Amino acid sequence: MTESYALFVAFVLGIVEGLTEFLPVSSTGHMIIVGHLLGFDGPKAATFEVVIQMGSILAVVAVFWRRLFGLIGIHFGQKPAQGHATLSLVHIILGMLPAVIIGLAIHSWIKAHLFGPQTVMYALVAGGILLIIAEKFRPAVRSETLDDISYKQALGIGLFQCLALWPGFSRSGATISGGMLMGISRQAAAEFSFILAVPMMVAASGLDLYKSRDLLSMADFPMFAVGFITAFVVAMIAIKTFLALIRRLDFIPFAIYRFVVAFAVYLVFVA
């Protein structure tokens, strides 16, 4: 792979990562397809994906930085409004705990058995079905805003997040659907999902990066930097656009799109 082509690949995959990481469509499925079409796969591609995910994480921090600092009691001299900042670090810990425990226990097994195209294809379909269930059978909204979310609901979202350990299922799809099925509004469930993503993705990406450290070299820096920066910028735009769209749109189009991507995976890798 020439240097110019490597930078092109980094730019394209950065766009794909930034667009899909926080939408309920599975970034893994998209990265597998696009990486294959670009001829970029294998151990280095997996490490590259981990690095550019950090760009997407940084985008969440940039969008929700006041909330994130508020979790640890830092408000930059501003007094929180009535009812504001009741979302606490306890909510985040409860949301993280199930996936952290199960993820650490079966991390190696997941890497060995669930990263194939066929299993990702099934996960895309399963995640799409969950989105439809969440839209069609969700109960009446009991938690309208982020600050209305209870500890019980946070733990429930954490349990749903375990589904995202299955590559292709979509972490945001699992957590947002879980939140809606527990009576959280679509908007609040999405916001909680994004905030919860920061510690979860930092932990997961940090672990993967540590295990892949021998694959990194300074020669890869330009490619990784382009992918990281592109993912950050695109993810910023995607997050803000998504939060605006879900005020008036449901998740059925995302479910249908997942089925289309699953069919594409079938055509490219399975058929």
From Swiss-Prot:
Annotated GO MF terms: undecaprenyl-diphosphatase activity
Annotated EC: 3.6.1.27
Its membrane topology: Multi-pass membrane protein
Gene Ontology BP terms: cell wall organization; peptidoglycan biosynthetic process; regulation of cell shape; response to antibiotic
Catalyzed reactions: di-trans,octa-cis-undecaprenyl diphosphate + H2O = di-trans,octa-cis-undecaprenyl phosphate + phosphate + H(+)
PANTHER family the record matches: UNDECAPRENYL-DIPHOSPHATASE
Protein name (database record): Undecaprenyl-diphosphatase
Lineage: Bacteria, Pseudomonadati, Pseudomonadota, Gammaproteobacteria, Aeromonadales
